[in-house]
A protein has these predicted regions:
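Primarily recognizes the serine-hydrolase "nucleophile elbow" in alpha/beta-hydrolase
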Residues: 147-202
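Short beta-strand/loop motif that positions the catalytic acidic residue
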Residues: 257, 263-265
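Alpha/beta-hydrolase active-site loop
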Residues: 112-152
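Accessory cap/linker subdomain of secreted extracellular hydrolases
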Residues: 114-122, 127, 183-256
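N-terminal cap/lid segment of alpha/beta-hydrolase-fold proteins
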Residues: 20-53
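Catalytic active-site module of serine/aspartate enzymes centered on a nucleophile-bearing elbow/loop
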Residues: 298-302, 306-332
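Conserved alpha/beta-hydrolase "acid-adjacent" motif
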Residues: 270-277
Length: 332
């Protein structure tokens, strides 16, 4: 096992559709994009009636797991974004891109655990595994951004790249490479890399020094990752190459940025101490282009914890988080 990020999905009740469902049925425009030889699904969320109105691009990099972007069951559809995009769509065209070789739309009855897509062998598709890599996502997304900014309905005056969880690492590296990016939103990330969240989560499970050496097991796992850092074998979970690449500390991308950066995180998330470290280090270095927004007492997806340290799903904070993003962007 390696670090498990719980995917939070909320159901929106919709009118029953016919047998053939398209992104338009769910309120999205779709663009089929070819990256190298790969067909890429791009979804655009725009304010109704403003589809052709010139606005900046808000490019959202989602977290891990090979999930279809649009998921539905007999009751309705699950939200594509973890937040309600309506407020952001007033000022932006919001874009999200599908995972490689994962269907765009799926009935949840056809999906595996955590709504993941599995093939006939019961595994994630091999073509997905071979592309589920940091640099693949970064390079692909930069090409998509270049393409979108050529469209008549996209303003190039501002380009916001945002990412949550795994997506924060992708977003931060995009911002470090592409001069087109004007603002970065870094949400729920670990500036010291994925492996540090894995170790932190396992350390929290330890109760004594003899029988619960979970952190030590993760450090042994990390040694295996480094030894086999080009391996794409996914029989035991994420390929070593994917874990290695996402464990390169994003702090080295972040601290070089001169554009406005917003860092959001829950203080009960495993990554919280490392975001605090980033903040301390930036203060020490006199960097003034960063804004930090900690959500006190909340976990990875901004849910508060109960007395027994379980997420309280009755209190949904994601819309507050996204509304603050909009407020921050208005000020920057």
């Amino acid at each position: 096992m390696k670090l498990i990020f719980t995917t939070i999905l909320f159901l929106t009740i919709l009118t029953t559709f016919g047998q053939t469902r398209t992104p338009k049925d769910f309120g999205f425009r779709q663009i089929d994009f070819l990256y190298k030889t790969d067909k890429v699904d791009i979804l655009i969320k725009s304010k109704k009636g403003d589809e052709n109105k010139k606005k900046p691009l808000f490019f959202f990099c989602q977290g891990s797991l090979p999930q279809p972007l649009i998921k539905y069951d007999e009751r309705g559809t699950y939200d594509v974004f973890p937040f309600n995009p309506d407020s952001l769509s007033i000022n932006y065209h919001i874009v999200i891109v599908g995972k490689p070789y994962i269907p765009l739309i799926a009935d949840t009855k056809t999906l595996g655990n955590n709504f993941t897509f599995i093939d006939s062998t019961g595994q994630f598709p091999k073509k997905y595994i071979a592309r589920n890599l940091l640099d693949y996502y970064v390079d692909r997304n930069i090409e998509i951004i270049k393409y979108l900014q050529k469209q008549t309905w996209i303003s190039s005056k501002q380009l916001v790249v945002a990412g949550h969880s795994e997506g924060s690492t992708i977003a931060s590296k995009i911002a470090s490479i592409s001069p087109l990016v004007t603002h970065l939103i870094y949400s729920g990330g670990n500036p010291m890399g994925r492996i540090m969240s894995i170790i932190q989560q396992s350390r929290a499970r330890e109760t004594d020094t003899d029988s619960t050496r979970f952190g030590e097991e993760e450090l042994s796992y990390w040694q295996d990752v480094v030894t086999n850092k080009t391996s794409l074998d996914a029989t035991q979970g994420d390929p070593y190459k994917s874990t290695f690449d996402f464990s390169i500390p994003p702090i080295q991308y972040l601290e070089k940025l001169k554009i406005p950066v917003l860092v959001c995180y829950g203080t009960k998330d495993w990554s919280s101490p490392f975001n605090d470290y980033l903040r301390v280090d930036l203060i020490r270095k006199g960097k003034s282009n960063f804004t930090f927004r900690p959500y006190i007492g909340t976990e990875h997806n901004y849910f508060p914890l109960t007395s027994d340290n379980r997420p309280n799903y009755e209190i949904f904070n994601w819309d507050k988080v996204a509304n603050y993003w909009l407020k921050w962007l208005d000020q920057k």
